[in-house]
Amino acid sequence: MKNLDHIAASVDWEKESLPEYQDLIFLLFFALFFPVLRFILDRFVFEALAKRMIFGKKTVVNINGREERKKINKFKESAWKFVYFLSTELLALSVTCNEPWFTDSRYFWAGPGDVVWPNLKMKLKLKLLYMYAGGFYFYSIFATLYWETRRYDFAAQIIHHVTTVSLIVLSYVYGFARIGSVVLALHDGSDVFMEIAKMSKYSGFDLIADIFFSLFALVFTSLRIICYPFWIIRSTCYELLYVLDIQKERTTGIILYFVFNALLICLLVLHLFWFKIILRMVKNQILSRGHITDDVREDSESDDDHKD
């Protein structure tokens, strides 16, 4: 562990360079790393944690029962996603919060000095964020298909992961990483609260679940429904035109403009779909006098749970 800390400390994370295609090999590395890490955590951490949190100190528990195993698996999924979303949110904030584009969207496309897109260099820590997140969502396509509990929004999840991977790869290659890093920071923050709420619900801590679901709904609405379209998409639709030389690179410029905005708007449509589900849950919470009911995204009865 000390050796890893020493290596990390010796790396110049502020070093800048242009993105290169061969950098994407690290995306594939993380795509292979995440399932291995999840398997280890599932077996040696999350399984025991789930049993302790759900069943307490009971020594005899029929975990072979369908409902008991189903609840354990759901807890483990949420624990894994909590670990990822918390880590990537902290990484995204550490990468972006001190950069000028974190507060001024004009710097998505220009600066420092006279440098403008597409000649924007990337710091090594920004490249790390991109490979880390890209690897996770690439792995998540297969995890959603073959590993995790299949829920009501299964198709939306697959579309989301494919769209996100496409955005990450294309924005990295074509120099849109500054705005991409802020998109990652906006997206993963609310999911931290959601996974805490779900783990609390599975564990029977209803008050904690109610509090964190309320926080999740508030953060989701603020970041994905308000900030995302009026900050991110506004910049890609309007401010990008100031630096995108369509006359010089007519074909490439038009393709970049419409492809990126189409993918970003696709994410917004998914946000609105999930926002509708959240509103339904808020309504149920109000009708049940402050307590959240079962997740309306829970698995359909016709689908089998994953087996560990």
UniProtKB/Swiss-Prot annotation:
It is a multi-pass membrane protein. SMART domains: TLC. GO terms for biological process: ceramide biosynthetic process. Its main location: endoplasmic reticulum. It comes from the Eukaryota. One of its GO terms (molecular function) is sphingosine N-acyltransferase activity. It is found in: Endoplasmic reticulum membrane. The keyword Transcription regulation does not apply. The chain crosses the membrane at residues 21-41, 82-102, 128-148, 165-185, 213-233, 254-274. Keywords: Endoplasmic reticulum, Lipid biosynthesis, Lipid metabolism, Membrane, Transmembrane, Transmembrane helix. Residues 73-287 form the TLC domain. Pfam families: TRAM_LAG1_CLN8. GO terms for cellular component: endoplasmic reticulum; endoplasmic reticulum membrane. PANTHER family: ALTERNARIA STEM CANKER RESISTANCE PROTEIN 1 (PTHR12560:SF38), LONGEVITY ASSURANCE FACTOR 1 LAG1 (PTHR12560). Mediates resistance to sphinganine-analog mycotoxins (SAMs) by restoring the sphingolipid biosynthesis. Could salvage the transport of GPI-anchored proteins from the endoplasmic reticulum to the Golgi apparatus in ceramides-depleted cells after SAM exposure. This is Alternaria stem canker resistance protein 1.
